[in-house]
Every structure is written in structure tokens, then in C-alpha cells.
């Protein structure tokens, strides 16, 4: 459905899991995130040593074509059924030239304070994304997810993984 909407506009492209070239630069998108405390679990994955967060809703849900599938034991489901971030990253298209590659990833890498929460001393970035960017060394990576990070005492809006600039 989202692809059909994007197709209606000349300059709109869904880059989730895809590569799109603009003026010699390749943009590669990835919209998955680690588990969060909210009920809607679309695009949620896990990592090997990830500890699930306390949930704000007793029931989780994953969207289907008309509604959403209710999951009553989310913690058990998240341990056994969720894909791993590293596997999602392995499936991304490869850039032709890493020095002109820009990864657009919803979730930030761990350890860079791009995912710093305001009210907890917690950086909730992804270890797998950090390792992926460290190995691939693209020109740039762009992230969202924790929009308050630059406004926190310890948070940052820009950092580096070797030659890769992460924003």
C-alpha cells in the first residue's frame, strides 16, 4: 500500500530495504528497530544480547492487511519469533561505491549517544547497526528514532565510526 502511494509522486521513493541513486550517491534504507515499550510492534527486531524493555501495554500487536494480530505474551514472542537485526542488515542491498553510500536507518548505532534518552541514563542504539557500519564504512549514516538525543546532557546529534559520519 505504501509503495502505491509513493508511486503517485514523481520525487517520492520508499527506500526501506532498497537502494536509490541520486546524483552519484546511493541511499540505502532500513526501517527496523529494536523492541520498544509501545503496543504496535511493526518493524520490531531483536539482537543476541538485547534485554526487552518494560511494556506500556499488556497486549502487543503487529499490523496485518485489515487490522492487527494481537500478541498476549509479548516477552516470550520476542525471544522466539522476532528476526535479528544482524540478519535484516545482511539482506540490505550493497552499494556500488561505499564512499558514496548513505545509509538511512531509523535506529541509531549503539555507543555513540545518538540514541540517548532524556529521562534515563540510557543510550538505546543497536549494537548490530554499530558493527555493520564499522564493517561497511559508508560515507554517511542518517538516523532518527530518539529525537530528543541532541537536547540531553549526554546526547549527541553527530558522531563517527572511523570514517563514517553518523547523524
What residue spans do the PLM features occupy?
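Glycine/small-residue-rich loop that forms an oxyanion/phosphate-binding "nest" at active or ligand-binding sites
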Residues: 2-18
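N-terminal cationic-hydrophobic initiation segments that often serve targeting/anchoring roles
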Residues: 6, 93-94, 133-134
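Conserved beta-sheet core of the metallophosphoesterase superfamily
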Residues: 16, 21, 111-167
Amino acid at each position: 500500500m505504501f509503495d502505491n502511494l509513493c508511486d503517485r509522486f514523481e520525487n517520492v521513493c520508499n527506500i526501506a530495504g532498497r537502494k536509490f541513486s541520486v546524483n552519484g550517491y546511493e541511499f540505502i534504507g532500513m526501517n527496523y528497530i529494536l523492541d520498544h515499550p509501545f503496543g504496535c510492534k511493526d518493524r520490531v527486531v531483536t539482537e543476541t544480547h538485547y534485554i526487552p524493555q518494560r511494556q506500556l501495554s499488556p497486549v502487543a500487536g503487529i499490523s496485518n492487511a485489515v487490522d492487527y494480530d494481537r500478541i498476549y505474551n509479548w516477552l516470550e514472542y520476542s525471544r522466539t519469533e522476532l528476526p535479528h537485526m544482524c540478519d535484516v542488515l545482511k539482506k540490505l542491498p550493497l552499494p556500488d561505491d561505499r564512499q558514496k553510500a548513505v545509509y538511512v536507518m531509523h535506529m541509531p548505532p549503539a555507543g555513540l549517544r545518538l540514541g540517548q534518552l532524556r529521562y534515563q541514563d540510557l543510550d538505546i542504539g543497536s549494537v548490530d547497526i554499530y558493527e555493520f557500519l564499522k564493517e561497511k564504512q559508508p560515507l554517511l549514516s542518517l538516523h532518527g528514532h530518539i529525537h530528543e538525543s541532541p537536547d540531553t546532557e549526554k546526547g549527541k546529534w553527530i558522531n563517527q565510526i572511523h570514517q563514517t559520519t553518523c547523524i
